[in-house]
Amino acid sequence: MDIQTVLSDLKLNGKVIPVVGGDVNQTYRIKTEHRAYFLKIHPNVKKGFFEAEVDGLKELSAFVRVPDTYMLGETSEGAYLLMEWIEPGKGDQRDLAAALANLHQQTAPQFGFRKDNYLGTLVQKNSFEEDWWTFFFKDRLESQISLAEETNRWNVQRQEKYLRFKERVLKSVEPKKITPRLLHGDLWSGNVFFDQQGHPVFVDPAVSYGNREQDIAMSQLFGGFRPEFLDAYQTIFPLEKGWKDRLPIYQLYYLLAHLNMFGESYGSQVDQLLENF
């Protein structure tokens, strides 16, 4: 997708600097005479792709620091989103833990969200449900499995493993009330940073109201968070007994999504988790 077409559409003139680090969008820092912007471009999608991101950022913005969003649109080649450029700085992982704990203190009557959104490039289903495990299996795991079936990344053997996994999960979890809490939804280390004042900044969410253990599970899946982050979170807002044992349940969701986005290179991790839980 041609960036000059997008800049013309935005009526922006400035120095264009590619920004590396993400797997989903083309990203740029646009330095104009008066300020800097962050521009995200994604080919072959409609602007609804970025409308979902803006909606998620607005949901988070009352409770944690997120970038402001200025304009989104689409061309014949794809869609774009113009955002605030926040200069990265250094910060304390304990402050990040406090910000996440504050986010997780926000609750809702039901699990889900008011509309579907995206995890990476994949549609994230968000129907409202009263029961957490009904929501999680249907709108998280099984929606990803359906996508994997469509691309021949799911077979009879994996389905059999999954059904046994599901049975073990439902037998192992205690029938206690789980409170729907506001989740970032894609909490890997690339989606949080610190600004120049040391404040945590949250980006690229896949927002819903769910079990907060899901955010913790993602934070521990691919690394990048120092031990003091989790220690501080536990001090501020302790997790329920047995939370460590349940993390693989939620990590399966993200591994399935990676299987769908990036292919069979994640298949062995999916298989191992299904077999070992």
Curated annotation (Swiss-Prot):
Ranges in a coiled coil: none
Keyword vocabulary terms for this entry: ATP-binding, Kinase, Nucleotide-binding, Transferase
Annotated positions binding ATP: E84, W85, I86
List of catalytic residues: D186
Catalytic activity: N(6)-(D-ribulosyl)-L-lysine + ATP = N(6)-(3-O-phospho-D-ribulosyl)-L-lysine + ADP + H(+); N-(D-ribulosyl)-cadaverine + ATP = N-(3-O-phospho-D-ribulosyl)-cadaverine + ADP + H(+); N(6)-(D-erythrulosyl)-L-lysine + ATP = N(6)-(3-O-phospho-D-erythrulosyl)-L-lysine + ADP + H(+); N-(D-erythrulosyl)-cadaverine + ATP = N-(3-O-phospho-D-erythrulosyl)-cadaverine + ADP + H(+)
Top EC class, one word: transferase
Documented EC number(s): 2.7.1.-
Molecular function (Gene Ontology), one example: ATP binding
Family under the similarity heading: Belongs to the fructosamine kinase family.
Function: Ketoamine kinase that phosphorylates ketoamines, such as erythruloselysine, erythrulosecadaverine, ribuloselysine and ribulosecadaverine, on the third carbon of the sugar moiety to generate ketoamine 3-phosphate. Has higher activity on free lysine (erythruloselysine and ribuloselysine), than on ribuloselysine and erythruloselysine residues on glycated proteins.
Protein name, UniProt field: Probable ketoamine kinase HMPREF0351_12196
